[in-house]
Amino acid sequence: MGTIVVTGSASGMGAASAERLRAAGHRVIGVDLRSAEVVADLGGAEGRQTAVDEILELSGGVLDGVAAVAGVGPNMRDAAAVASINYFGPVALLNGLRGALERSDAPRAVVISSNSASTVPMIDETLVELMLGGDEDAAREHAAAAQSALPPRLIEASPSISAYATSKLALAHWVRRTAVTPEWGRKGILLNAIAPGAVLTPLMTGSTGADKDFDPDSFPTPMPLGIFGEPEDIGFWVEQFLRPEARFTTGAVLYVDGGTDAAMRPTAQPTALRR
């Protein structure tokens, strides 16, 4: 069995992923703000470096997998922090741990995006470019300015919805771009993303008010299966992507959303290559 890092391991999808991986016999190095093997704040450069350093020490410099699950939701009032935590945090961590992954016989990495990247019509293309360009200071400044320009009623209801959806889209694009580079693909480090939908976690309840007693048919987006997801539904796919047998899948974005994206964008995938 392998050594696998799981960020956001103290609650929600991260906790479910860590539990499933431990049950499968893996050694899990959890990363979170509390109750984890590595306690670090991935929202800033210092915390990210602390996390990388401690993970490398605990793992002996060899990792078989990384599951970047940690993130914050659209109800967070600081849009700049959302950009840092949801995009720059996982990207910096994965880049910092790439060398340790390369030393494994079957290295795997998976990150958590969101179906909000394709179902929320508030993507900030400028912010996407700044994120993919790696300019965190400019991205934070832009996210804060864009948030202040939103209608007050929207800021009150979901203060960082645009920054949230945009950060998750940029993260999915980073995965697809990065997975096929020689530094990842030709080194055998497989990198994929999961795009969850309405999953009953503290993050979703805090963002939407939906809990286990909430009627799925009253949710703002379509719920074709008539149920909400559970953290364990995401943990299942995290484990699948990290398995050594998953040897021919990289650069994928898997929607685990009960059919929401398919209901809203039935012809969006696959997209034909234009001549």
Where are the regions that the model predicts?
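N-terminal Rossmann NAD(P)H-binding glycine-rich loop of SDR-like oxidoreductase domains
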Residues: 10, 14-19
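Rossmann-fold cofactor-recognition segment
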Residues: 33-50, 55, 71-72
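Hydrophobic structural elements of the Rossmann-like NAD(P)H-binding subdomain
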Residues: 67, 110-112, 191-194, 204, ...
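Conserved NAD(P)H cofactor-binding loop of Rossmann-fold oxidoreductase domains
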Residues: 67-74, 259
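Catalytic loop of short-chain dehydrogenase/reductase
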Residues: 72-76, 102-186, 198-199
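C-terminal helical subdomain
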Residues: 92, 163-165, 169-172, 193, ...
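Short C-terminal tail/terminal secondary-structure segment
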Residues: 250-275
